[in-house]
Amino acid sequence: MHGLIVNQLRQFVVRTHGRKLWNRMRADTGVEIAEVPAIDRLYEDADVVALVQAAAAASGADAQVLLEQFGEFLAPALLRIYAPILRPEWRTLDVIQHAEARIHRVVRRQDAQAAPPYLTATRSSADVVEVNYESPRRLCAVARGIMHGLATHFNERLDIQQPTCLLRGDPACRLVGRLIS
């Protein structure tokens, strides 16, 4: 997993549950990740999964809920980092619609080992975006959280339905985001 994501996971855990929990997660799992993970390297997916499971166990939160909250937390950082390649007039649904072409392709070009999820997004109407999410990591909860985080950033409200999900055995997650007026 990309170091930026792991670094943001650390920031999320520290901000929501304290530095002590982050250090305890690292100790309990035996995962060898620095106190502050480097953003310019890749981390083993299994290590990150172990950290998330440890955070869920220690906080008493459901892992999927925790991942969705992390996605919401992550959205503003992603917007700051990728602002130069996003159009200034774009809002929530526009950013979601163009995430694959504008962000994920750039990430893959910059680092051949980076493996962001594959997204296919289409607008079925002015206020609806439909996203197919495919990734062996099966972190659709993070994607949902990012979508909510984008809406919060743009002072919009977004209802997300998920008719299919990798975690339920479907071949892909389908996320349908509808702006609420």
Report residues per predicted region.
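Amphipathic interaction/junction segments at domain boundaries or subunit interfaces
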Residues: 47-141, 164
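Short, mixed-charge aromatic SLiMs
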Residues: 32-38, 74-78, 171-174
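Long amphipathic alpha-helical segments
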Residues: 22-60
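A broad structural signal for alpha-helix termini and local helix breaks/kinks
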Residues: 17, 29, 59, 151-155
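C-terminal non-catalytic interaction appendages of large macromolecular assemblies
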Residues: 128-181
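Generic solvent-exposed, charged/amphipathic alpha-helical segments
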Residues: 10, 14, 71, 100, ...
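Charged, compositionally biased N-terminal leader segments and the immediate start
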Residues: 1-37
